[in-house]
């Protein structure tokens, strides 16, 4: 994720006299030299965007070095990864019996450790590009390093889904706060509309949870696959439209919400029920409407960005064919696959 962050730090100044001849210019240069292109406080710093506050230049009195120091608050454009993030393009740089290593081609510099397993170890080849999901563990940003490190696995369709039980209405103020995420989804949908339709179909079908035959198609216009018939008694709700209605107090968020696997992964749809009849493996999660919508919207954003990145990365048939072994691994993990 790309974002703005504010940091506080203390800089050592070797030549206070020269530094103070043009404090702003020297300070900006010093910050860029120390932090840009490196890890710092759980982020990878891309650019210094401003100096918010600074102290005077103090002279060290604990020794006779003549050096100084300055306390600084500055803003920076940063990139950072979170647990369970999806990365569409990770290039395999090492694969042996003990470990698989990959480097992200799309995010800030990060080395990803893919724990060796019989299936993944026998499939992924050095030089190939694989889609990866980060594990439920911290991404490590060691200060001063020029790349982060993380663990993950080749991303395969998920069989499980969560059900959320909302017992309080979403307020207009909360709905307004969610419009930033809605705007991101709308921008990603606009970008998606410019992609090659054949590529979108290929990757949506690849990541559809159920195994389907070649003559079965996905209906990208209504964001459902052939297994959508199983829930035909329910009408899916467009989350984006729902939130626009919530701004006008024209919708109710009470009840049980879920995004079961019959919907396409990047679908902006969800199902809402008065009584829980979802066939989920876990008990419903009781939470506020705001928490539930933030969770759903971020999931939609992750999948939409993931699908767009897949289309951009594997942008020709030759490249797609060179990775048929990866696609086969993904297909074999689907519900209904004939082993």
Swiss-Prot record:
Q: What is its main location?
A: host cell
Q: Which GO terms describe its cellular component?
A: DNA-directed RNA polymerase complex; host cell cytoplasm; virion component
- Asked if the Swiss-Prot or TrEMBL record annotates the protein with the keyword Signal, the reply is no
Q: Which cysteines are joined by disulfide bonds?
A: none
Q: Which domain of life is it from?
A: Viruses
Identify the keywords attached in UniProt to this record, alphabetized. Answer: DNA-directed RNA polymerase, Early protein, Host cytoplasm, Transcription, Viral transcription, Virion
**Stated induction or repression of this protein's expression:** Expressed in the early phase of the viral replicative cycle.
Keyword Transcription present in the record's keywords: the answer is yes
Any Gene Ontology biological process: viral transcription
Compartments it resides in: Host cytoplasm; Virion
Similarity field: Belongs to the Asfivirus DNA-directed RNA polymerase RPB7 homolog family.
Q: How does it assemble?
A: Part of the viral DNA-directed RNA polymerase that consists of 8 polII-like subunits (RPB1, RPB2, RPB3, RPB5, RPB6, RPB7, RPB9, RPB10), a capping enzyme and a termination factor.
- Give a short account of what the protein does: Component of the DNA-directed RNA polymerase (RNAP) that catalyzes the transcription in the cytoplasm of viral DNA into RNA using the four ribonucleoside triphosphates as substrates.
Quoted from the entry, the domain comment is: Contains an extended C-terminus, with no homology to characterized proteins.
**How is this protein named in the record?**
DNA-directed RNA polymerase RPB7 homolog
